[in-house]
Amino acid sequence: MSYSETQLTALAKNNPKELIRIITSPNSDVHALTFGAEILGGEVADESLVLPALRQLLRHVNAVVREGAMIGVSAFYMEKKPPQDVLDRLKKMSTDDPSPACKDLANSLLEDYNK
């Protein structure tokens, strides 16, 4: 099933566990995964819900989904650094990710978190 950004945002606000189920499901489309990760990081405040989903999506096979997960990390961790394992994953992505856009975004996030 495909979801609009409006639907994903409504889920984040009203039923974040359902949003997480959707974006961690292997059958979800790239659009739902990407925008769902971004929305999750920006709309849901419970780290115990957000962090496991973003950790999973940072390792997704699709570069667009990984980029969305990084945007979600950036949105969720605006006021503090992410956990060390997420920083380690970003560091690995900044050098080893096959996508130049993902490498650049990972580098940018690491620079921001090291200020």
Predicted regions span which residues?
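Amphipathic alpha-helical scaffolding segments comprising HEAT/armadillo-like alpha-solenoid repeats
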Residues: 10-24, 45-59, 81-94
